[in-house]
Design a protein with these regions (language model features):
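C-terminal beta-strand-rich structural cap/linker in extracellular carbohydrate-active enzymes
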Residues: 321-362
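Short secondary-structure boundary/capping segments
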Residues: 16-18, 77-81, 132-140
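Hydrophobic faces of well-ordered beta-strands that scaffold small-molecule active sites
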Residues: 1-3, 62-64, 117-119, 217-218
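Active-site-proximal substrate-binding groove within the catalytic cores of carbohydrate-active enzymes
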Residues: 95-316, 329-331, 336-344
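The substrate-binding groove and active-site-proximal loops of carbohydrate-active enzymes
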Residues: 28-47, 81-96, 194
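Active-site groove signature of glycoside hydrolases
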Residues: 47-79
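Active-site beta-loop-alpha junctions enriched in small/polar residues
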Residues: 2-8, 67-69, 120-124
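Active-site-adjacent "subsite" loops/lids of carbohydrate-active enzymes
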Residues: 1-57
Length: 365
């Protein structure tokens, strides 16, 4: 269920908020011209709606999209106001939301049902929230964007660079201590309104790179008319690999420089048992030679001994027959805009063999 607590992001938002108030179900926040998301009666009504709806339709995912744009300062509403930076309102508002989340989870738990809660806009991306929700939006990026670091680059490379530059801002510049697995990043987007066109090869590159960022779930913003048989199979293969290796990918960390400043960078993820995934990318139009050292700077455990290296995505190289241990070095060349994804371990977990699948067509008349 995708629901906007503040009433959406359109010109209709103020009108919707006024209808909520007129119906006695909450209030208009005149400071931001949307629904007052700190109102006690609004949250009571919303909690009942969410609880009943999740139960009736067995909903296991809630995307709560848009919270408090501006604190409400109306003293006639059923919430407190005042304090430095309106913190009286903010504190009470979030406490009410915490109570809502808690009771909602308790309701689902009684039926032995899971519930994934995703908080999007106007939320501080603090790991503190992970006591109550499963994921939080990055907050610092557009739904989709394209980097301007180079004029002559494919659309897919500009999009990848843009999103990773926002990750760099989030993880490195702002140094927000937030686990990658709980980030909501809007990917993958391959829809009509996004105005993107990717070949099958570019689609594969886009999907597998996004998986290496480590997020635990994907919202598939895909327009069916833009998909073909090859793209559906690429998507299925990526999702199988991502799911099978989430125990590794969830530990992803961003290494290197800001890709929007034409820096080579990587995502590296390891387990204590020595399973690892390293994704390297060159966001520039120049060939780059580099030495990859398997040490603690790359997140490698010091007990790494004699593991194999498998190509998850590598269009210019064959699988290596060498065994790698802690401290070993790999000499790598990255062509312009090239990316490589290596998986380390005792066995091949790339999920290359397809599961039992059949081609089929759904027709609607």
């Amino acid at each position: 269920l995708w629901l906007g607590p503040r009433g959406g992001y359109t010109a209709a938002t103020p009108r919707f908020a006024k209808k909520i108030e007129k119906g006695g179900n909450g209030y208009l926040n005149s400071d931001s011209m949307d629904i007052c998301v700190g109102s006690e009666k609004y949250l009571q009504n919303l909690e009942k709606f969410l609880t009943d709806t999740c139960t009736e339709f067995d909903i296991q995912y809630l995307k709560l999209d848009g919270f408090c744009l501006k604190p409400c300062t109306n003293p006639k509403h059923d919430h407190i106001t005042g304090g430095e930076n309106d913190m009286y309102f903010v504190t009470e508002m979030w406490q009410r939301w915490i109570d809502l989340f808690t009771r909602l989870r308790e309701s689902r738990a009684k039926d032995n049902k899971p519930l994934w809660i995703n908080m999007t806009c106007y939320v501080n991306p603090s790991p503190w929230w992970l006591q109550y929700v499963n994921s939080v939006w990055l907050q610092n990026s557009m739904d989709i964007g394209f980097a301007k670091n180079l004029e002559q680059q494919a659309q897919v490379d500009a999009e990848i660079t843009y999103r990773d530059s926002m990750y760099y801002d989030f993880m490195c510049t702002r140094a927000l201590q937030f686990p990658a697995k709980n980030i909501y990043n809007h990917e993958p987007i391959y829809g009509n309104t996004a105005k993107v066109e990717y070949t099958d090869e570019e689609f594969e590159k886009f999907l597998f790179w996004n998986a290496c960022r480590g997020q635990a779930f994907n919202e598939l913003y895909l327009s069916y008319n833009k998909m073909n048989s090859a793209k559906w199979r690429i998507l299925a293969r990526m999702l199988r690999w991502q799911k099978a290796n989430h125990h590794i990918l969830k530990n992803a960390m961003l290494l290197g420089g800001d890709p929007a400043e034409n820096n080579i960078y990587a995502y590296a993820a390891w387990t204590k048992a020595g399973e690892g995934i390293i994704a390297l990318r060159n966001p520039t139009d120049e060939k780059t030679d580099l030495t990859l050292t398997l040490n603690k700077l790359m997140g490698c455990p010091e007990n790494l001994r004699a593991v194999k290296c498998y190509n998850v995505y590598n269009t210019t190289g064959a699988d290596s027959l060498d065994l790698f241990s802690y401290g070993d070095k790999m000499q790598i060349t990255l062509a312009p805009f090239e990316m490589k994804i290596f998986q380390f371990g005792d066995r091949d977990n790339r999920c290359l063999a397809p599961e039992n699948t059949n081609d089929f067509t759904l027709s609607f008349t």
